[in-house]
Amino acid sequence: MKVILTENIDSLGLIGSEVAVADGYARNYLLPKKKAVLATEANRKVVELKRVKWEAKIAKEKALAEEMAKRIEGVKVTLKAKVSEEDRLYGSIKVKDIQDALAEKGVEVEKSMILLAESIKTLGTFEVPVRVFAGVKPEIIVEVVPED
């Protein structure tokens, strides 16, 4: 089913984009939550009228995201963890731990913005991307050290 997005959806595209999605996804999620409208000729005309406003909104959001990316890029957080004799962590470092460490440094991000593929289970230094906007992903440095 073809739909026109009425808001930015990370997995699909930006506002105003016409995309093809599964019928059930459109009927059960996108359309009821007003995140998209059916791609009919009438809706295309309405979207064209709103496009200028949306493009200005996207430009403003992207500018704010790039400013935030400059603040975040290269931020180094150090997390202490209990380790075994083989330098394996008891437990792991999760997204919430990184979010809390960033908050202590004055950088407020949502958990969903931190793109950690899997929990960190070893000591060392890791580069973790943070998605602030579509295509804008600065990296932070997470250092895991043993607790004294």
From Swiss-Prot:
Instruction: Read off the Gene3D superfamilies from this record.
Output: Ribosomal protein L9, C-terminal domain, Ribosomal protein L9, N-terminal domain
Gene Ontology cellular component terms for the protein in this record? ribonucleoprotein complex; ribosome
Q: What is this protein called?
A: Large ribosomal subunit protein bL9
Q: What does this protein do?
A: Binds to the 23S rRNA.
Query: What gene is this protein a product of?
Result: rplI
Spell out the PROSITE patterns in the cross-references: RIBOSOMAL_L9 (PS00651)
Q: Which family does it belong to?
A: Belongs to the bacterial ribosomal protein bL9 family.
Give yes or no: UniProt keyword DNA damage: no
One GO biological-process annotation of the entry reads: translation
Output the superkingdom of the source species.
Bacteria
Instruction: Give the keywords, sorted.
Output: Ribonucleoprotein, Ribosomal protein, RNA-binding, rRNA-binding
UniProt xrefs under HAMAP family: Ribosomal_bL9 (MF_00503)
Q: Which GO terms describe its molecular function?
A: rRNA binding; structural constituent of ribosome
Q: Mind telling me which Pfam families this protein's record contains?
A: Ribosomal_L9_C, Ribosomal_L9_N
